[in-house]
């Protein structure tokens, strides 16, 4: 089986990371911001796996499992905050969250 070249895997990870970063900066909806963060975390995990497979080390796969568990925790906490913001302000706009500061 032919492995994917390091350059191609890192290029895909870079494109995904940039896509998530653009979504993070452009969108004002909290749900889309959380989705953009997930895309960025998955891009970083992909870079770990590609780099680990290049040198034949299982460290990339271990980091992938760690990143996925971190992403699951981030998603659950983020969605809980999102639900509370929606219940309180009836909107998912980020500017509504700045009103919480007082």
Curated annotation (Swiss-Prot):
Keywords linked to the UniProt accession: Cell inner membrane, Cell membrane, Membrane, NAD, Quinone, Translocase, Transmembrane, Transmembrane helix, Transport, Ubiquinone
Membrane topology classification: Multi-pass membrane protein
Location of the protein in the cell: Cell inner membrane
BP terms from Gene Ontology: ATP synthesis coupled electron transport
Any GO CC annotation of this UniProt entry: plasma membrane
Substrates-to-products reaction catalysed: a quinone + NADH + 5 H(+)(in) = a quinol + NAD(+) + 4 H(+)(out)
EC number from the UniProt entry: 7.1.1.-
Family matches, as PANTHER family: NADH-UBIQUINONE OXIDOREDUCTASE CHAIN 4L, NADH-UBIQUINONE OXIDOREDUCTASE SUBUNIT ND4L
Family under the similarity heading: Belongs to the complex I subunit 4L family.
Protein name, per record: NADH-quinone oxidoreductase subunit K
